[in-house]
Amino acid sequence: MATDIDMLIDLGLDLSDSELEEDALERDEEGRRDDPESDSSGECSSSDEDMEDPCGDGGAEAIDAAIPKGPPARPEDAGTPEASTPRPAARRGADDPPPATTGVWSRLGTRRSASPREPHGGKVARIQPPSTKAPHPRGGRRGRRRGRGRYGPGGADSTPKPRRRVSRNAHNQGGRHPASARTDGPGATHGEARRGGEQLDVSGGPRPRGTRQAPPPLMALSLTPPHADGRAPVPERKAPSADTIDPAVRAVLRSISERAAVERISESFGRSALVMQDPFGGMPFPAANSPWAPVLATQAGGFDAETRRVSWETLVAHGPSLYRTFAANPRAASTAKAMRDCVLRQENLIEALASADETLAWCKMCIHHNLPLRPQDPIIGTAAAVLENLATRLRPFLQCYLKARGLCGLDDLCSRRRLSDIKDIASFVLVILARLANRVERGVSEIDYTTVGVGAGETMHFYIPGACMAGLIEILDTHRQECSSRVCELTASHTIAPLYVHGKYFYCNSLF
């Protein structure tokens, strides 16, 4: 029977859908009832076994070699699939004539020999067995027992039984092994999962060694718990609260009205004026016989720049004397530095430009006499105050001016502090003051001349005292005429002449 079935499979026929198989099963049952002494009752029908690729495990030659070469079946069973199944040699004589080849088997012709290298086409390619054998859903007699020959134990013929094949429908009924039969599910170790091919199947029979199993479902995978961390667990983040003023702070703000009074404000002004009468605390700069005595002493009233005007020649002649006074009196110099910082931050634009010229002219005098640039000096040590006040006064105007000239912005000039960014008098003042302020903030003991753009053996000849004020006023006036913006014109005009004409609308004070 196995030989005929191979012939049908090679022809691309599906035995599961033909009526021959059903007819063969019926005739087989009748033959078994007629012959109760037959030992083939334990055999499985060729359509009930797992089908395997005839090209595997030795190919067609191995299958042909495994087919029993006994005498043909009884004549009365010829012409049916089951009747062609070989019977034991004891029930048929050696001289009996072979059965007549009638019926469908004779019409199909001679079986074509299959080559082990030639792949099967048609339906055979689609019904190749899966990687693992699936248990027959009916169980019972379908499983094959090991060690049993073709005709049962003690049979006369010891020829090995050929591999059985199953139709496509029977294979689909078995399906793959269920996930419960796997050994790599939850609770199984890694070694057990690797030895899954050697574990017992659901039906109780051992699986072939080395066969692959179907992947387990996602929920059956064993997940390794995360390693315990010795650090404390991160507390859960709370939702950000609303951004409000603390009630205690609100109470403090409202309590100001309880303490504010005209008398108390007046007393505060009086105490501040008393402190300013002697800012040095009885230890001022020694001014006896000094050409700088008028400026070293304290005075009441405002500052008049014209009364303090000196020429470059006078500064060169008497500048070293003032320099030595600052260096010889560090405590007085520290007080003078603090007082100068407060004054510089309250100046208008013209006064701020004069302070910038004062700082640069002082540096030029020091370089002229080869004196170190000391950060503790009251004039050099307050370069940051001059820069911040100038930037505040010039920012509304410089935003338009620097952009129109294609230069770096105000903040970039002050933060980069590069000599290569200097393109005009405005950028020169801002960059040099920013470099001096940076050195003072870093706390260096001495500032080198390259900070102000002077190389070794050079003098600050490119700077003329007064260039800051004259150059910035010129820039303001020129850009005001060139720019078509009315806002820029108003800004430049008020920067040069800060006269109040409009802007403030009320003054409200409910306390005093």
UniProtKB/Swiss-Prot annotation:
It comes from Human herpesvirus 2 (strain HG52) (HHV-2). The lineage of its organism: Viruses, Duplodnaviria, Heunggongvirae, Peploviricota, Herviviricetes. This is mRNA export factor. Residues 228-240 have a biased composition (Basic and acidic residues). Residues 104-112 are annotated as: Interaction with host ALYREF. It is found in: Host cytoplasm; Host nucleus. The modification Dimethylated arginine is found at residues 138, 150. A zinc finger (CHC2-type) spans 400-488. Coiled coil: none annotated.
